[in-house]
Amino acid sequence: MFKWKKSLFWRIPVFFTFGALFVCAESRHKDNKQPPSQGGLLQALYSLNSANGTFLHKNNSTDIISLLLEKVECPKNVHGKQDPCTQCLRPDALLFMVGINKSSDIDDDAIQKISVVLLFYIMNQKDFCTSISNLTKMDYKFYRNSLLKLRKDEDCHYLSLNEIDDILSVSKQYFQLLEEKQCTDVISMEDAFAMVGSTAVDEIKLPRLAEIILTLSLQRVCITRKQFPNAEFFTDFIFQSFNRTNDLYAPDIAELIGELKATGDCSKLSNRRKSVRSVIPQKDNELLSNTNEEKGHDHSDIYEVEAHSRYWHQTHSCFSVYELVKVFFKNSHSPVSKEQFKQISPAIIHQLLTCSCPPASNGTTRLAPPTTLEKYGYSTISVLLLTIGSMFGATLIIFSSCEENYKLILQLFVGLAVGTLSGDALLHLIPQVLGVHEVVTHEHHMQQGDYIFEENEYLWKIMGMIGGIYGFFLINKLFFLLVSSPKQGLSLMNGHLTHSHDLPLDAHLGDQSRKAKSSSTIQLRSPDDCEHSEVPETLPVRPKARRKSKGISLLAIMILVGDSLHNFADGMVIGSAFSSSTETGIASTVAILCHEIPHEMGDFAVLLNTGLSAKIAFLMNFISALTAFAGLYIGLSLSANPDVQIWIFAVTAGMFLYLSLVEMLPEMIHVQTQRPWLMFFLQNLGLLLGWLCLLLLAIYEHKIQF
């Protein structure tokens, strides 16, 4: 007796707790403006089971699956009805289909896989349990791929909107939700269940979508498309707000202009405008603008409009730009002509008048600006890291002991320098100078997947320019390798391009290594430093020529000046970023470091290629890196004047293009080696890596956040 009372005492609060949750869920469903409950399928089963006065143990997988099969295979019994029902699925068979043991707990991943199988069962209930089809013996991948291939004319890797419409239509009929008044649209479902609908549903998103559909179906909630008014609604709304039917008068237009001017402060919106409820009937009872509806697929049963829905009551709905365009035109991403703009203007005015869309927000709390100590401390550490990164080019010294390997590795980094220098100028500096490198924040909605090309369209056009440069480089290089003989190539280089070969590159690494000298046969020199006579390969190097090679060539000076300006500008950018916030400064440091390391490594290779010793090249690289500190402190003190930065970027871009395309690229074409095809591969590898690095930086640098 005591145990029975104790059990009853324990059950009463549990019963009332779940009962209260169920009542709250039902009360939320009565308001069509609120999204459904965010609980998953398991939570829905617990709620339904507790409403019947029983308790479901979470660790009993067999009981959970049995209850789920009962609710799915017998939809009439969801709320306690006991109509006769034939079940063909067994709990152990269902668990076997998704690869789960009976003793295992049912977690979210398992319930989502089970939802996929049950959704397939709903779509193929007539054939699922027949002995002919043998569908009960398939594995999970079969059911998943079958749902993705629901329509033969659609992409088999994604579940399109049309296929989702088919699933919703069948599910609505299967669970007999046609007469239910409580419905939620796909947009509300995404918000409530954290479903991202920016792209089509793939095999990763499908299990979550299947769980949501089953959850809402068991809760007697139907899912429809987001409802849109027809094109005439917006004009009719404006006229109705002035109590006009067909004509507006001058005072009405003056009042309209005044309303538009006051929309900056929505709190001052007139009560009359707020109280206007659209009672404008839809033409031909058309509530939804299904401009993209395919012929032969009638889903009118899903979007069945009841008598009270003949009027558009969602006056203050916020429509995205693409949704507004879709209301009027078939292609929401097509350009809008002047005539089409006349049609869409009332919709824009409607959104302004009703203050439907809240001000754009980045969703983050603005932090307090960094203190002076933080700005100078963090920024100094960041530039120090950049300086250390720029010194990585010194690693090329280890290859100077073997002339042939040194030559090959050097050409790899020369190609990397050409790719990073030209890529930095074309993909980063020039767009920034022209003002097209700004970060544009787009709203997230169902068409967001198309933004990837539109947002970075200028980058793909610039990549076309780079493709032209690379294509002609390949033609010239292959012509040199396949057609020109080594002797002709040497004569061409000495006579036309004034590139001298077989001159030594001394690697003075210390007093003990002065005897170990290596010569570079791929030396870049300016016209003033070169003799116009052809130098035979067997000709010994004279001391005068050796001393002359120790001088600093014009190319080395240009690289020093260009790098100094670039690092100076980088320092100003970092100073400006840390003046804004610590997070922005760290993100900018990471972004600059991504292209600074390969850039400086390539520059170090070119400095060695001009005939400088390793020590001098290292010193010049270090001196150019120090200018970042000057730019940093000037940027911190002057808040990095954007006008000054733009001019620095413009001059730097010109220098980078000249260095990479005029001085360095011709050398890559005519350099000779004993292994020409291996060098050709390394040169291409360096070029492509440099361009790819700067392309990825241009696309994703604004997404680096901390």
Curated annotation (Swiss-Prot):
Entry's localization field: Membrane
Record Pfam families: EF-hand_Zip, Zip, ZIP4_domain
Bilayer disposition of the protein: Multi-pass membrane protein
Catalytic activity: Zn(2+)(in) = Zn(2+)(out)
Keywords: Membrane, Transmembrane, Transmembrane helix
Residues on Cytoplasmic side: 225-378, 429-462, 575-617, 668-678
Region feature (Disordered): 516-535
Expression (tissue specificity): Highly expressed in brain.
Biased composition (Basic and acidic residues): 526-535
Segments crossing the lipid bilayer: 204-224, 379-399, 408-428, 463-483, 554-574, 618-638, 647-667, 679-699
Record-given protein name: Zinc transporter ZIP12
Organism this protein belongs to: Xenopus tropicalis (Western clawed frog)
